[in-house]
Swiss-Prot record:
GO cellular component: cytoplasm; cytosol; mitochondrion; nucleus; tRNA-splicing ligase complex
Organism placement in taxonomy: Eukaryota, Metazoa, Chordata, Craniata, Vertebrata
Name of the gene encoding the protein in the UniProt record: DDX1
Annotated B30.2/SPRY domain residues: 70-247
Keyword hit for Hydrolase: yes
Tissues showing expression: Detected in embryonic retina, brain, heart and liver (at protein level). Detected in embryonic retina, brain, heart, kidney and liver.
Protein residues bound to ATP: A46, E47, T48, G49, S50, G51, K52, T53
EC number annotated for this UniProt entry: 3.6.4.13
Listed name of the protein: ATP-dependent RNA helicase DDX1
Length: 740
């Protein structure tokens, strides 16, 4: 409890954590919890089972609770934006004179719009009528923006009418929809100075202190109106300085900061906000935190963690809701109407509720994307961008949206690209590093070569049912076509899977198949062997886990496998991602994954907690034709066996190439074993019993200590000598002075 409390975790959560036997935080928790509690965006990567869920759930629960507590007690917090006339007494950007997607920070100076298709603008709370004035704008990112001056009559789209004058990052000045080249381009980290001489009717700009020359001369009718600092943004962030802080590049020639304008020359904005107060009341269907998971199982797992962590939180109690498909939406809507604080869900149902207005995102403080690489792999990039654009970047109480991204690896280009788009200067917490295979995992490859192993010809019809990719092809022995070899590979892989189970007397394993139909076919083949879901204790007892199974069935199947009621879990990558399954002694890859990172995810499920594990991958020597659905139905009812480039839904799958990429990625050569799948005794580890701890673990460590012992003794002697010399030097000055 003390260990978590030292990180700033509230006692109620620390007590719940202690009851879960979490005496010390894991590495990812120790790094991430303080960062999130401190208000930052965090990108975290660590192995599955390392405590990532706790690393984001604990601080999210605490901050949501503190926010609700403050609201209940009537506190507005240090960062609350003032309303009504109070806003107009300060030089800042006006929250009541801005576009719908334009966010203003608690200081009134930091501004942001994350709308990527439309421009959204804003004006300052006060304008000037006489004199020479200056303000600065700092660019915080690489988005598009225009800054300058406008009257109260001007459009918020600065520079598109005769009442506004703007200077844009593309090096163009704009007035009345006329865009002319001026100065030079500017972008992130640049500071733009905006000069206004009302008496002469002149406007000019500077970049990082460099005067860019006269930009506009405005007509007399403009001089009779108050001019306000203004900007317009598209997916950009700026910070204004009206002179209350020291300017980076102080103006010369008699220009002064706007905040020093004499009262007689200052006019307050007509937009006072008296009828437009930013909504602060709590809506029942507006949660404070949204956690997005790639699968139902992972969402349920995360929700259970949230329930455990909030166990002792009271006054106010936190209300959580699981939003997933396959469950009656009516039940979820009734809970939403009663009020929720934390929502955990999967993209499909979340998208439905958000698009219909049933789930309101206006008060979200936290957006958590768990297993982000999995979400992107499933094609949810547009969904993520869509919901992010609907969440205010700064809430009504002045707090900034925090985005937390968890991924099995941060070395994915897509994850990096996403973080640059939706996160605000995120801190990277990468405790995983480059992919590597744990020492407790033996992984081997079995080459499936139908040209040398003719077993498939002798089986007749007594083989695994295949995926019907070759339903219209001639695959009979003797055809000698790529289609025949492909069908033979599918048959042999079913036989090799059964052979591996018998050879190693597997009592528990995860079997990864590439598609949902492959999973179903493997389950059916195990039933033909006398096993299946209802044969508890049988050598081939199994359950199936993939997206087409009903949620309740998936949940029950997972629990049955965890309890040991069945020996084998047959699943796809997507269904198994992030599921908390420990200590499985065997994994069989019926087909290599097309993403090399997924190979490490799969085999990383064995050999945990110092227990040895064996991962067997069946790799086709020839190319295999497989389903690759690009149709709108995502494979349901699709039998288009033409290749993708011909408008169909199949591809030729080259596992030998994938194997090469995996070996290059891991910087190692994976051992190959014969089709009899007998794994030779390792010269280093000796005879290994998979699922049990390494017999030589302690001995190896002891040997390592013996090797280091002489060096450590030498180091101790040197340390003693250094300390003694230091003590002698301490007395030396006094002795020297005595001699004189």
């Amino acid at each position: 409890m003390a260990a978590f409390s030292e990180m700033g975790v509230m006692p109620e959560i620390a007590q719940a954590v202690e009851e879960m036997d979490w005496l010390l935080p894991t590495d990812i928790q120790a790094e991430s919890i303080p960062l999130i509690l401190g208000g930052g965006d965090v990108l975290m990567a660590a192995e599955t089972g390392s405590g990532k869920t706790g690393a984001f759930s604990i601080p999210v629960i605490q901050i949501v609770y503190e926010t609700l507590k403050d609201q209940m007690e009537g506190k507005k917090g240090k960062a609350t934006i003032k309303t009504g006339g109070a806003v107009l007494n300060k030089w800042q950007m006006n929250p009541y004179d801005r576009g719908s997607a334009f966010a203003i920070g608690s200081d009134g100076l930091c501004c942001q719009s994350r709308e990527v298709k439309e421009w959204h603008g804003c004006r300052a709370t006060r304008g000037v009528t006489k004199g020479k004035y200056y303000y600065e704008v700092s660019c915080h990112d690489q988005g598009l923006c225009r800054v300058g001056w406008s009257t109260m009559q001007a459009s918020l789209d600065l520079g598109t009418d005769k009442f506004g004058f703007g200077f844009g990052g593309t090096g163009k000045k704009s007035h009345n929809k006329q865009f002319d080249s001026y100065g030079e381009e500017f972008t992130m980290h640049d500071t733009i100075g905006c000069y206004l001489d009302i008496d002469k009717g002149q406007i000019k700009f500077s970049k990082n202190g460099k005067d860019l020359g006269l930009a506009f001369e405005f007509p007399p009718h403009i001089r009779n109106q108050a001019l306000f600092a203004a900007c317009v943004l598209k997916n950009a962030e700026l910070k204004f300085n009206f002179g209350e802080e020291d300017f980076k590049f102080p103006p010369k020639d008699g220009y002064i900061g706007l905040c020093k304008a004499p009262d007689g020359n200052v006019v307050k904005s007509q937009h006072t906000g008296n009828a437009q107060v930013v909504q602060t009341q709590n809506l029942p269907n507006a949660p404070k935190a949204l956690i997005v998971e790639p699968s139902r199982e992972l969402a349920e797992q995360t929700l259970n963690n949230v329930k455990q962590f909030k166990k002792y939180i009271d006054n106010p109690k936190l209300r959580e809701l699981l939003i997933i498909g396959g469950v009656a939406a009516r039940d979820q809507l009734s809970v939403l109407e009663q009020g929720v604080d934390i929502v955990v869900g999967t993209p499909g149902r979340l998208d439905d509720l958000v698009s219909t207005g049933k789930l309101n995102l206006s008060q979200v403080r936290f957006l958590v994307l768990d297993e982000a690489d999995g979400l992107l792999l499933q094609g949810y990039s547009d969904f993520i961008n869509r919901i992010h654009s609907q969440i205010p970047q700064i809430t009504s109480d002045g707090k900034r949206l925090q985005v937390i991204v968890c991924s099995a690896t941060l070395h994915s280009f897509d994850v990096k690209k996403l973080s640059e788009k939706i996160m605000h200067f995120p801190t990277w917490v990468d405790l995983k590093g480059e992919d590597s295979v744990p020492e407790t995992v033996h992984h081997v490859v079995v080459i499936v070569n139908p040209k040398t192993d003719k077993l498939w010809e002798r089986l007749g019809k007594n083989h695994i049912r295949t995926d019907e990719v070759h339903a219209k092809d001639n695959t009979l022995p003797g055809a000698n076509t790529p289609e025949m070899w492909s069908e033979a590979i599918k048959i042999l892989k079913g036989e090799y899977t059964v052979r591996a189970i018998k050879e190693h007397k597997m009592d528990q394993a995860i079997i990864f198949c590439r598609t949902k139909i492959d999973c179903d076919n493997m389950e059916q083949y195990f039933i033909q062997q006398g096993g299946g879901p209802d044969r508890k204790g049988h050598q081939f007892s199994c359950v199936c886990l993939h997206g087409d199974r009903k949620p309740q069935e998936r949940k029950q199947n997972l629990e049955r496998f965890k309890r040991g009621d069945v020996r084998f879990l047959i699943c796809t990558d997507v269904a198994a991602r992030g599921i908390d399954i420990h200590g499985v002694p065997y994994v069989i890859n019926v087909t290599l994954p097309d993403e090399k990172q997924n190979y490490v995810h799969r085999i990383g499920r064995v050999g945990r907690a110092e227990r040895m594990g064996l991962a067997i991958s069946l790799v086709a020597k020839e190319k295999e034709k497989v389903w690759y659905h690009v149709c709108s139905s995502r494979g349901k009812g699709c039998y288009n066996t033409r290749l993708k480039e011909e408008g169909g839904c199949t591809i030729w799958y080259n596992e030998m190439q994938l194997l090469g990429e995996i070996e290059e990625h891991l910087n190692c050569t994976i051992s190959q074993v014969e089709p009899d799948i007998k794994v030779p005794v390792d010269d280093f580890d000796g005879k290994v019993t998979y699922g049990q701890k390494r017999a030589l673990g302690g001995g190896l460590y002891k040997g390592h200590v013996d090797i280091l012992a002489p060096t450590v003794q030498e180091l101790a002697a040197l340390e003693k000598e250094a300390q003694t010399s230091f003590l002698h030097l301490g007395y030396l000055p006094n002795q020297l002075f005595r001699t004189f």
